[in-house]
Amino acid sequence: MGSNGADNAHNNAFGGGKNPGIGNTSGAGSNGSASSNRGNSNGWSWSNKPHKNDGFHSDGSYHITFHGDNNSKPKPGGNSGNRGNNGDGASAKVGEITITPDNSKPGRYISSNPEYSLLAKLIDAESIKGTEVYTFHTRKGQYVKVTVPDSNIDKMRVDYVNWKGPKYNNKLVKRFVSQFLLFRKEEKEKNEKEALLKASELVSGMGDKLGEYLGVKYKNVAKEVANDIKNFHGRNIRSYNEAMASLNKVLANPKMKVNKSDKDAIVNAWKQVNAKDMANKIGNLGKAFKVADLAIKVEKIREKSIEGYNTGNWGPLLLEVESWIIGGVVAGVAISLFGAVLSFLPISGLAVTALGVIGIMTISYLSSFIDANRVSNINNIISSVIR
C-alpha cells in the first residue's frame, strides 16, 4: 500500500482492499500511475442504464451493476486508486454487487462480490415509522449508520460510529443507498404479494373446512374475503376507528351472543396455541412471513383474542395489528400474518355453534380492516350460519 492508501483503506467505510468504486477517489494503490478523474476510484461508476444481470435472481439475491467508463480520460500522475497499478480508465470493466437476504435474521443482508471486497459484508435494514435505517458493518466495532426519512435520499444522514480518521464526501454513499432503496422497495413488493397469496389460500382453505359445517353461504363469503386479501397489494388498512365500527355491527347481531360453553371452548382452543410452534409454521410458508419477533406477534394475537372472548373488548386485538404497521410492517404483510394466525387456530372437537362464532369472527376481523361492504355481507349471512 502507498503511504496515503493505507490510511484510506482503514478509514474509508466504503473502500478497502480492491473495492472498485464505492470508496474514496484515492485508495490503497501506489502514487504515480495515471487515473481517471471521474469522482470514483479508477474510472468506476454506477451504471446509468440497466444491465442484463440487474435486479432479482432466482436464488433470491439482488444484483447492482457498476462499470468502468470508456470515455474517461486518464490524467498523468496522482493516485492510482484502489486497484494499485491499473490507472487506465479507458478499458471497459463491469462488476456486480450481490445482495442476499439473510434468512436467519429478518432485515439483515449479506453483501459480497466475487472479485472485489465491498463496503461491508453485512447490512442491517429496518423501517421505523417511515424512516429507513441502514447499518453498514465495516469491521469489528466500526459501522456506518445511514438514515433516510420518508425514503427520500435527499434527506439522507450518514453517521460514522467508532470511526477514526477523516470523513469523506457522502456522494458515493448516497448513490449506493439509492440503489439499495430500489432493491428494498422491490423486495417489499415481492414479499407482500407472496404473503397475500399464501394468506388468501389459508383463509380459503379454512372457509372450505368450516363450510362443511356452516353451509355454502359461509364458504362463498369466505372465498370472497380470501380474494379481497389476495388483491390487497399496495393498499392501506382502514383505520382502527373504521375497523372497530364495522366489527361492532357484527358483534351487535343477536346471533353473536356466545353461550358460556362455546365461549369456554373457544378460549381453550386459543390457550392451546403454542406461539413458537405456530410462528415456525407460518415462517415456513415463505420469506414474506419471516418478520421480526414473529413468535411475539403470534402470542399477542393469542392473548388479545382470549381477552376479546372473555370480556367482549376487541379493541386491543385490532390495535395490535395496527401497531405492526406503525412499527414498519407493510400493510399487506400485516393482514396476511393476521389471517395466517387466525387460520391456524385448532378447531377439532368444537361444537358447530362454536365453529360458527370462530368462522364469522375470523372473516369479520379481516374484512373490518379491508372493506366495510364485505363486513355488511358477512352480517347478512350470520342468521344462516349460527343457528
From Swiss-Prot:
Instruction: Please name the InterPro entries in this protein's record.
Output: Channel_colicin_C, Channel_colicin_C_sf
Q: Where is the composition biased (Gly residues)?
A: 14-30, 78-87
Q: Which UniProt keywords apply?
A: Antibiotic, Antimicrobial, Bacteriocin, Cell membrane, Membrane, Plasmid, Transmembrane, Transmembrane helix
- Source domain of life is Bacteria
Ranges for region Disordered:
1-106
Cell location: Cell membrane
Q: Which GO terms describe its molecular function?
A: pore-forming activity; transmembrane transporter binding
Q: Which residues cross the membrane?
A: 325-345, 350-370
One short Pfam name that applies is Colicin
The UniProt regions of compositional bias labelled Polar residues, in chain numbering, are 1-11
Membrane topology recorded in Swiss-Prot or TrEMBL: Multi-pass membrane protein
Q: Name one GO cellular component term.
A: plasma membrane
Can you tell me which residues the record assigns to a coiled coil? none
Q: Where is the composition biased (Low complexity)?
A: 31-48
Q: Which GO terms describe its biological process?
A: defense response to Gram-negative bacterium; killing of cells of another organism; negative regulation of ion transmembrane transporter activity
User: What's the family?
Assistant: Belongs to the channel forming colicin family.
* Function, in words: This colicin is a channel-forming colicin. This class of transmembrane toxins depolarize the cytoplasmic membrane, leading to dissipation of cellular energy.
What is the name listed in the Swiss-Prot or TrEMBL entry for this protein? Answer: Colicin-N
Q: Which organism is it from?
A: Escherichia coli
Which lineage?
Bacteria, Pseudomonadati, Pseudomonadota, Gammaproteobacteria, Enterobacterales
Tell me the gene name. cna
